[in-house]
């Protein structure tokens, strides 16, 4: 079964998309076509949005699922005329919370991601810059400032995990790709030895690694199953020999991988 899902907001759409994606992930047997539509902040945009939703409904033969964080009542009423199933994220959770706290919420556009009111903004930017500057072993002389250093074979998910932890939690995470030479020596590169307490390993199933590498360099030694199987086997041997905690990333989302790493290493999030 195929269904369409829209994440609609008069702000950035981050809240609608994040929560909506998490909810849809619980329905593994349904394929969703997902559309994020931020800054739907005028009557004209809302009417155009209704046309998109209705077209998706006609194409799919099912009502699209709509996750929205729209504040403006006029815009919400226009969206409600569409042939979609609407889930108002804020009102769903705020109404019972207001009752419990006996306080009205400041239901304002972009409140949860407002730069002006978010003391974590600079921490987030600095963490992302750190992850980018220290990606793929490009620099190693700033590892003393890292909260974590992810290690593993090429294309096992190190970079997206580092960026996710930076964006979501302000974690300064570097990553270092272990090469064939490192594996044959069965010892950590010199750049990592002084920071072994910060290391966390990522591994991956060889067949999945083969598929990923074939998208980048098809029909090469780098992407061959034999090479991928060798690298995975040897890097896991290295992790065990050096007592480096590690996780197989094959069947986990980047959110799950990040959470497991932070728990295992006991690293505190800079913001929550």
From Swiss-Prot:
Catalysed reactions listed for this entry: [pyruvate, water dikinase] + ADP = [pyruvate, water dikinase]-phosphate + AMP + H(+); [pyruvate, water dikinase]-phosphate + phosphate + H(+) = [pyruvate, water dikinase] + diphosphate
Entry-linked NCBIfam families: PRK05339.1
Coiled-coil ranges per UniProt: none
Job of this protein: Bifunctional serine/threonine kinase and phosphorylase involved in the regulation of the phosphoenolpyruvate synthase (PEPS) by catalyzing its phosphorylation/dephosphorylation.
EC number: 2.7.11.33, 2.7.4.28
EC class: transferase
Keywords in alphabetical order: Kinase, Nucleotide-binding, Serine/threonine-protein kinase, Transferase
Protein name per its UniProtKB record: Putative phosphoenolpyruvate synthase regulatory protein
Family: Belongs to the pyruvate, phosphate/water dikinase regulatory protein family. PSRP subfamily.
InterPro entries in the cross-refs: Kinase-pyrophosphorylase, PSRP
Pfam families: Kinase-PPPase
Annotated source species: Pseudomonas fluorescens (strain Pf0-1)
Binding site for ADP: 152-159
Top-rank lineage group of the source organism: Bacteria
Molecular function as annotated in GO: ADP binding; ATP binding; phosphotransferase activity, phosphate group as acceptor; protein serine/threonine kinase activity
